UniProtKB/Swiss-Prot annotation:
Disulfide bonds join C44-C58, C59-C72, C62-C81, C84-C99, C102-C117, C105-C125, C127-C143, C146-C158, C149-C166, C168-C179, C182-C194, C185-C190. TNFR-Cys repeats lie at residues 43-82, 83-125, 126-166, 167-195. This is Tumor necrosis factor receptor superfamily member 1A. One of its GO terms (molecular function) is tumor necrosis factor receptor activity. Glycans are attached at N54, N86, N145, N151. Both the cytoplasmic membrane-proximal region and the C-terminal region containing the death domain are involved in the interaction with TRPC4AP. It comes from Sus scrofa (Pig). Residues 1-29 form the signal peptide.
Length: 461
């Protein structure tokens, strides 16, 4: 009566028939294809590949940097691999029949070569420092400069594949990765980032002006001050006292130049000294005024620096009738005055008690001052032992009166030197060392005169 059926087989056959009619492709997928079965059976372990002609044979893959020249001839035999040529590479194990060509960095994209191509590695391209990669595809990228965040701060630094992320200051908004002033805000997007009105923008500008203006004024004042100090130190004649205060040193005075009148410093009483040991004045009245000790400062001549003391004239006009003699004749018992001993270094002069300046009168000191040339005076007092500080101090004390300053220097040397050493012989020795023998003779001639008084004061107009 119908087809005989095997128990348990009817139901699967019916289901298969139904599936074939409804889902033919799905049923076909349930049945293994002969080629797939062959591939599954011929799968090789890692590091090997199936022989293209005999799927049952597994050949060893070629190492990176090499390519497949010939397949292995049988199981357990080596594959014939060859090294890649220049300009080609293989970066992993393979069974390629030829190597891959090396890539080249694209200069139009600002790419630079990081490392060259080798047989086992492709060329590595990248960007310069402070640049990042902007990818246009999976492999194509362009190098762009990292943003410096002007008018803002760096929130995230620049990375290899990402630009700098900036955080803009108040009054600025971010547009195209740049912080732009809110003054240029024209659309609704930036207005959300710039809620400030025109008043706040003006406040921001006023804040900048408030900060910069004091700095400009401060640096301007500093520049003017240093310029003023430089001019004061350069042109000392303008303000001598200001120059002394600012520059920390005295105003230099040209030696030999006439100086304005200034009050000379007062010295204590000085006893009269005569370089002629045998001469002594008498008590008889004489019209020639005699020198008295100085007790208070008086006007002193300031323009005698270039005038030397000369010996008195050999002939003196006779006095008027009825007037007594100018100087009385010494008694017969009074010895005749002996001439002033020369300032020499002979044994006789050394043993004959050299004239000491400890008790010298101002006339003797003025004779030395007038005898030494002004251009050599500082050298003269330096040789006597005065320091630069003392010389400058005495110049300042006497204002611009050169002659009184020189007198003060000589008096200072006499004061600080012992009585035994402060002698005319020492001054003469210094003058000889300075090759000023003519000046030495002029001083000796001036000191031999009967009247050794300082010249009359002469006031500058």
């Amino acid at each position: 009566m119908g087809l005989s059926t095997v128990p348990g087989l009817l139901l699967p056959l019916v289901l298969r028939a139904l599936l074939v009619d409804v889902y033919p492709a799905g049923v076909h997928g349930l049945v293994l294809h002969p080629g797939d079965r062959e591939k599954r059976e011929s799968l090789c372990p890692q590091g090997k590949y199936s022989h293209p002609q005999n799927r049952s044979i597994c050949c060893t893959k070629c190492h990176k940097g090499t390519y497949l020249h010939n397949d292995c001839l049988g199981p357990g035999l080596d594959t014939d691999c060859r090294e890649c040529d220049n300009g080609t590479f293989t970066a992993s194990e393979n069974h390629l029949t030829q190597c891959l060509s090396c890539s080249k960095c694209r200069s139009e994209m600002s790419q630079v070569e990081i490392s060259p191509c080798t047989v086992d590695r492709d060329t590595v391209c990248g960007c310069r420092k402070n640049q990042y990669r902007k990818y246009w595809s999976e492999t194509l990228f362009q190098c762009l400069n990292c943003s410096l965040c002007p008018n803002g701060t760096v929130q995230l630094p620049c990375l290899e594949k990402q630009d700098t992320i900036c955080n803009c200051h108040s009054g600025f908004f971010l547009r195209d990765k740049e912080c732009v002033s809110c003054v240029n805000c024209k659309n609704a997007d930036c207005k959300n980032l710039c809620p400030a009105t025109s008043e706040t923008r003006n406040d921001f500008q006023d804040t900048g002006t408030t900060v910069l203006l004091p700095l400009v004024i401060f640096f301007g004042l500093c520049l003017a001050f240093f310029l003023f100090v430089g001019l004061a130190c350069r042109y000392q004649r303008w303000k001598p006292k200001l120059y002394s205060i600012i520059c920390g040193k005295s105003t230099p005075v040209k030696e030999g130049e006439p100086e304005p009148l200034a009050t000379a410093p007062s010295f204590g009483p000085i006893t009269t000294f005569s370089p002629i040991p045998s001469f002594s004045p008498t008590t008889t009245f004489s019209p020639v005024p005699s020198f008295s000790p100085i007790s208070s400062p008086t006007f002193t001549p300031c323009d005698w620096s270039n005038i030397k003391v000369t010996s008195p004239p050999k002939e003196i006009a006779p006095p008027p009738q009825g007037a007594g003699p100018i100087l009385p004749m010494p008694p017969a018992s009074t010895p005749v005055p002996t001439p002033l001993p020369k300032w020499g270094g002979s044994a006789h002069s050394a043993h004959s008690a050299p004239a000491q300046l400890a008790d010298a009168d101002p006339a003797t000191l003025y004779a030395v001052v007038d005898g030494v040339p002004p251009t050599r005076w500082k050298e003269f007092v330096r040789r006597l032992g005065l320091s630069e500080h003392e010389i400058e101090r005495l110049e300042l004390q006497n204002g611009r009166c050169l002659r009184e300053a020189q007198y003060s220097m000589l008096a200072e040397w006499r004061r600080r030197t012992s009585r035994r050493e402060a002698t005319l012989e020492l001054l003469g020795s210094v003058l000889r060392d300075m090759d000023l023998l003519g000046c030495l003779e002029d001083i000796e001639e001036a000191l031999r005169g009967p009247a050794r008084l300082a010249p009359a004061p002469h006031l500058l107009r």
